[in-house]
């Protein structure tokens, strides 16, 4: 089992790092008290090989040696990788002032500045025990995400999952769509009696639609649009992209266009999936 522990000062980006780990397939637990780590690993044994936890100052043992002892008692088959995220006092003060969130060590008589300084002192011993120390003072969330990903994978490239989904407008539009295209203006196989019982996955329907210049031009234009903007979407740290194609009933035109687009992009570096909502619900 591979265990990644993310610690660091509050406001330095632990939640961002944890989201990266979640996107990479890790089972993530936020703010786990360290005494519960053994119990968590026992429960997850056999069900997942990738586990990530984040711990903040409230869950850290006060003594450096106690932390070392807990980590050294991990099961022999556990591969531990640890991160410590830090930022300057000035940057943390600015971040908390902008978000108006409460610092974990803030009390009624403790100022934000005092809480930030106190946390730095408490966590200083921990910062010396980790494998990777990252100063996020001058990093935005995308820079931090890329840095964590590069440490874990050796590259900043991430696999974007592209979901092509066909649907019928008469049954409602999919709420999860990032891009939505209406193909109800295309020639409709429904009006061909021999094609009506079929779907866009059947060869006679595919042959009919492939012979329509409008259909081919529309598919080509969507392909060009996506190829143009996919690199920008990737740089924005997206993990999933859903392109929905809708016709009236979700049986012929949308199914065919979705199937063709999925085939066109299946040769790319991305993971491509095709789903036909109305066919699956039939």
Swiss-Prot record:
Chain sites annotated for binding GTP: 56-59
One GO molecular-function entry: GTP binding
Positions bound to ATP: 8-15
Name used for this protein in its record: Nucleotide-binding protein Ssed_0723
Role according to the record: Displays ATPase and GTPase activities.
Source species, domain of life: Bacteria
Family according to the record: Belongs to the RapZ-like family.
Key words, A-Z: ATP-binding, GTP-binding, Nucleotide-binding
InterPro entries for this protein: P-loop_NTPase (IPR027417), RapZ-like (IPR005337), RapZ-like_N (IPR053930), RapZ_C (IPR053931)
